[in-house]
Curated annotation (Swiss-Prot):
Keywords: Developmental protein, Metal-binding, Transferase, Ubl conjugation pathway, Zinc, Zinc-finger. The lineage of its organism: Eukaryota, Viridiplantae, Streptophyta, Embryophyta, Tracheophyta. E3 ubiquitin-protein ligase involved in the regulation of organ and seed size. Acts synergistically with DA1 to regulate seed size. Functions synergistically with DA1 to restrict cell proliferation in the maternal integuments of ovules and developing seeds. Seems to function independently of BB. Possesses E3 ubiquitin-protein ligase activity in vitro. Polyubiquitinates DA1, DAR1 and DAR2, but not DAR3. One of its GO terms (molecular function) is zinc ion binding. Disruption phenotype: Increased organ size, biomass, and seed size and weight. This is E3 ubiquitin-protein ligase DA2. 'Da' means 'large' in Chinese. Plants overexpressing DA2 exhibit reduced organ size, biomass, and seed size and weight. It is an enzyme of class 2 (transferase). Interacts with DA1 (via C-terminus). Transmembrane segments: none annotated. One of its GO terms (biological process) is regulation of organ growth. PROSITE patterns: ZF_RING_2.
Length: 401
């Protein structure tokens, strides 16, 4: 009668009632600790084992295996007594938080060794946690793959757009070049190929500032050029009509006309690179055409005229050839006249050489100024060419025999 039923206390050995030296903690009250262990409020301080066993539990703090562990009241997580004493500092005024769920006022209780049912429940919970972690990881990987796919699609679309633009630009450039080549290259049968690249027009409003005074000066120059041209035509018609009649052989020898080389100073032009060469060639062409219109039987032995815009080397070579031919015939004429003193020897020596050459007229050079500025520049160049021709070209003496 009067006996009280209760749980039988576990008999704990004395050596398990004090710390085993896992941590160096001098603030532990050994007497109080022993009392709590004897009263089964804390788990005994068993020595931890490194190897796992089916009867042992692992402490998630020190990762050692013990026969029994304490349990957190907040989250029911297991922890050994020495780790709990390390977390729960008795001299600290701040409340201790749970190392697992961060709940304040951390406290534990000892329930003894876990039963099979409790171990099964813990395993199920652990499995759920693992599955949840796996699902989260898979979702993160799927999101990363979707982002990468979107980036690849955007990059491929931008690359295809750039490729299309490049192809369109290349085809348009090829078509433009083919059109330019077809328009610029004009093949001829008896003359060389003449190329004249069209210069693109630009906005010259900022570069060219032509006032009224300059326009009047240019107009006066143009009028003077026209007057000089008419005078030059009349003078050249009288000079170039020279024929040497030979009464003995009833034949005549035509003296070749004097072609005056016109060399313009090679100064760079802001309007076009080859404009000065083109203007010089046009001026010479006009002079040669005017002289040949009065004398149909006198032609200059010029094989071909080929002039590229911006390059006057071939033009100067042609002039030097023409000058050399004239000088050769002129010196030969005077030398033979002085040696024999008669026209018969000159005629015979001149006629015994190569026969008369029918020199084809040079092909026409079509140069059309594009703007008023180029027209004024052409007028000035023609005027300079005419003045240079009148000052440097001496009239050829005509001797009738």
């Amino acid at each position: 009668m009067g006996n009280k039923l209760g749980r039988k206390r576990q008999v704990v050995e004395e050596r398990y009632t004090k710390p085993q030296g896992l941590y160096v903690n001098k603030d532990v009250d050994v007497k109080k600790l022993r009392k709590l262990i004897v009263e089964s409020k804390l788990a005994p301080c068993y020595p931890g084992d490194d190897e796992s066993c089916h009867d042992l539990e692992e402490c998630p703090i020190c990762f050692l295996y013990y026969p029994s562990l304490n349990r957190s009241r907040c989250c029911m997580k297991s922890i050994c007594t020495e780790c709990f004493l390390q977390m729960k500092n008795p001299n600290s005024a701040r409340p201790t938080q749970c190392p697992f769920c961060k709940t304040p006022n951390y406290a534990v209780e000892y329930r003894g060794v876990k039963s099979k049912e409790e171990k099964g429940i813990e395993q199920v919970e652990e499995q759920r946690v693992i599955e949840a972690k796996i699902r989260m990881r898979q979702k993160e990987m799927q999101d990363d793959e979707e982002k990468m796919q979107k980036r690849l699609e955007s990059c491929s679309s931008s690359t295809s757009a750039m490729t299309g633009e490049m192809e369109y630009g290349s085809t348009s450039a090829i078509s433009y070049n083919s059109l330019m080549d077809d328009g610029e290259i004009a093949p001829s049968q008896n003359a060389s190929v003449v190329r004249q690249h069209s210069r693109p027009r630009g906005n010259r409003e900022d570069e060219v500032d032509v006032d009224l005074e300059e326009l009047m000066v240019m107009e006066a120059i143009w009028l003077s050029v026209q007057e000089t041209g008419t005078q030059r035509n009349s003078a050249s018609g009288e000079i170039t009509s020279s024929r040497q009649y030979v009464t003995d052989n009833h034949s005549y020898v035509s003296s070749p006309p004097r072609v005056t080389p016109i060399v313009e100073p090679a100064t760079p032009s802001s309007s076009s690179g080859g404009l000065s060469c083109a203007i010089s060639a046009l001026a010479e062409r006009q002079m040669v055409g005017e002289s040949s219109s009065h004398n149909h039987n006198h032609n200059v032995n010029v094989s071909s005229y080929s002039m590229l815009p911006g390059n006057c080397d071939s033009y100067y070579d042609i002039e030097q050839e023409v000058d050399g031919i004239d000088n050769h015939h002129h010196h030969r004429h005077h030398y033979e006249m002085g040696e024999t003193g008669s026209s018969n020897s000159y005629v015979s020596s001149y006629m015994t050489g190569e026969g008369f050459h029918n020199f084809p007229p040079p092909p026409p050079l079509v140069i059309v100024p594009e703007s008023f500025e180029e027209q004024m520049m052409m007028a000035m160049a023609v005027s300079m060419a005419e003045v240079h021709a009148t000052t440097t070209c001496a009239p050829t003496e005509v001797t009738w025999q």
